[in-house]
């Protein structure tokens, strides 16, 4: 994790060295899971995604804080990426069946209702597997705090609520599509009679959890196979099945019912 993981190695040139770093870490004996967090989409390319997809102990999951999709909002934010490239990155993810998480902002100065509608349409179109959002909050001394067309707090809140309501439905449909599948779960704790863990598709502290029952004790920190039996918007429920070390499932097989949230 870093402020921008994809910038690794760019001090020696323009090309990110993150793919090479991932390969080297993945080759270390005992590394069960390797997850890249907070990668800005500007430097995400097919080379990085193909490297991640090829290595069995690298999670099919990437966290890309996109912030917005309106080109003029991205420009006002001083983001060097373009709306067109962000859409292309999303296409590359879906093509490879990889899990995509993003963070979006509402209420940046100058955000019109048309800009927000474009953002909502983008979320409907892409159907992010994981998404967080926050409202713009001006900080003293920053350029954005001095920009004209500041958005009223009540408008920010209303847009935030609409966006998160939309994503709630998206997330529920995505999770329901996982019912009946089996995934490898890292056991993190026990809560009452059930265990709590996460698969490669849930990042720690930011995503939901998998709650599962087991007829036999599970060691905290171990990996078990869990069959998903029920879904909520952000959490999954299941039951432990027999242990297999090679129980990695492809996300492209988990999220096929895309019409459910239209």
Language-model features: where?
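Conserved SAM/AdoMet-binding glycine-rich loop
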Residues: 1-114
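Radical SAM enzyme [4Fe-4S]-AdoMet core and its adjacent flexible, acidic
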Residues: 8-30, 76, 138-169
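Conserved, mostly hydrophobic/aromatic
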Residues: 36, 64, 103, 123, ...
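Contiguous mid-protein beta-loop-alpha structural module that forms a pocket-lining wall or clamp
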Residues: 111, 123-128
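Terminal RNA-binding accessory module
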Residues: 135, 146-262
